Regions:
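Conserved catalytic alpha/beta core of Sir2/sirtuin-type deacylases, generalized to analogous enzyme cores
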Residues: 1-254
Length: 254
């Protein structure tokens, strides 16, 4: 979803290295860079990657596709819930209510203690200056409770210290939403969900299997295949949403 806003595509080493050539020179993949051990052994290096991403996400303006989704919701007075594996906070930035979003891998805009010393999760208001040549942070955010290193509240690779409480609360809200709408007709619009980390694809397919009145629409430029009667649209997020919007406009005679 974020690629059409100008955010990098981390799928595959080449896409990651195009966005972060420093890691290509070091021979580090996305999984290598997104390893929580960096915060323990070399926090300036760990925060170099996540500090740069924090700054990038703060500066990024959500694309028109977010507005199209909002228009559909408003026009139809529709109930909705967003499930995302993105950690960039773009849905909140586009104006979607935080209590209607499930961030399955957490959010870069929230922090926790590296140990962790407690179960608190707090907003990330840190200003993180990063040396782009070395991808090392010039300052290290600290835990306000124990003065140890803090880290993003994101589920990383090989991560045993991530605090899931915030995501668990969102998951509970999503389950309540599904129970409330168990007999309703539901459209699941899955956008840009890959197979390497299939969390979102598995969720939409499970909903499509388990609920009789569900249509799943998969928008994906590469991995777009889906079993009938569900629908695939082989293109990027913005183009796919625009296609659906034009179709709905034609159906309504607008």
């Amino acid at each position: 979803m974020g690629v059409d806003s100008g955010l990098p595509d981390f799928r595959g080493d080449q896409g990651f290295w195009k966005a972060y050539p420093m890691y290509a020179r070091l021979g580090l993949s996305f999984a290598d860079a997104a390893n929580p051990q960096h915060f323990e052994h070399d926090p300036a290096f760990g925060w170099g990657f996540y500090g740069h991403r924090t700054n990038l996400y703060r500066e990024t303006v959500p694309h028109e596709g977010f507005h199209i989704l909002q228009q559909w919701i408003s026009r139809n007075a529709a109930e909705f819930f967003i499930i995302t594996s993105n950690v960039d906070g773009q849905f909140q930035k586009a104006g979607f209510s935080d209590d209607r979003i499930l961030e399955v891998h957490g959010s870069i805009h929230h922090l926790q203690c590296i140990k962790p010393c407690c179960h608190d999760i707090w907003p990330n208001h840190e200003e993180i200056d990063v040396d782009l040549a070395s991808m090392r942070a010039r300052s290290i955010p600290l835990c306000p409770y124990c003065n140890n290193i803090s880290r993003p509240n994101i589920l990383m690779f090989g991560d045993w210290s991530w605090l899931p409480e915030r995501t668990n609360s969102q998951e509970s809200a999503f389950q309540t939403f599904m129970e409330r709408n168990s007999s309703s007709r539901i459209a699941v619009i899955e956008i840009g969900a890959g197979t390497a980390i299939p969390t979102i694809r598995a969720t939409s397919e499970r909903i499509g299997r388990n609920h009789a009145k569900v249509a799943v629409i998969r928008i994906n430029p590469r991995e777009f295949q889906i079993q009938p009667p569900h629908i695939s649209i082989p293109c990027g997020a913005l183009e796919g949403l625009q296609q659906i919007d034009r179709y709905l406009g034609n159906m309504s005679g607008k």
